[in-house]
């Protein structure tokens, strides 16, 4: 989300990896496409609800709560896939999400653009979205303005969970399954780098959906270029770490 509560992203990669594995496992077991997609999104929603409960009700610091659930999700994913990659074949109605094209445009690109457009409108032009943004940017100031910050934090966690759950499903379709890697740290560093690099597009340093999307495409292109030139994933993470630091400094 376009706020500076970056600690909320701690478990993003782990949740995407979990729902990706879940969708792959269900499809391998013969579950319907609709059930696999719904299950992935539902698990994302559940994790968002758990994070919200830990932060809002139990009052565990955000960083600690999301870090804890990240480790739990990594453990669940390792147990679920038994440390093995889950590979699926092309499945009508599912593979089209990650591999399909309309003319020369990838379907997954259109899905991402559509979701981002909806989020941009939501955060910029709706009362609920603006209040969620204000709560994430400065909870204390939002409270002083009379906003029900607990309500908007809950909505933020739930919406984040839904989006990350769906992202895992898309990743499963795009990669024809799920890898055995459960850390999710690559996804985390990319998400943080895109969010903070996107803030450089604003004169006030404001994080935004559009800036994040543009930065995300830049980071994806950069990562692919580095891979083509023989750079390892570990080295790419180092490069993205430098980009993250520079983005914050800017």
Where does each model-flagged region fall?
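Transmembrane helix-bundle core of multi-pass membrane transporters
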Residues: 58, 62-125, 152-155, 174-180, ...
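Transmembrane alpha-helical segments in multi-pass inner-membrane proteins
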Residues: 164, 175, 179-238
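Membrane-helix/interface signature in polytopic inner-membrane proteins
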Residues: 118-158
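Hydrophobic core segments of alpha-helical transmembrane domains in multi-pass membrane transport
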Residues: 20, 70, 74-75, 109-120, ...
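Alpha-helical transmembrane segments within multi-pass membrane transporters and channels
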Residues: 31-69, 114, 215
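Cytosolic-side transmembrane-helix boundaries in multi-pass membrane proteins
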Residues: 9, 117, 137, 143-151, ...
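Helix-loop interface residues and adjacent transmembrane-helix termini in multi-pass membrane transporters
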Residues: 7, 29-30, 57-59, 203-206, ...
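Short, small-residue-biased leader/transition segments that mark boundaries at the very start
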Residues: 1-6
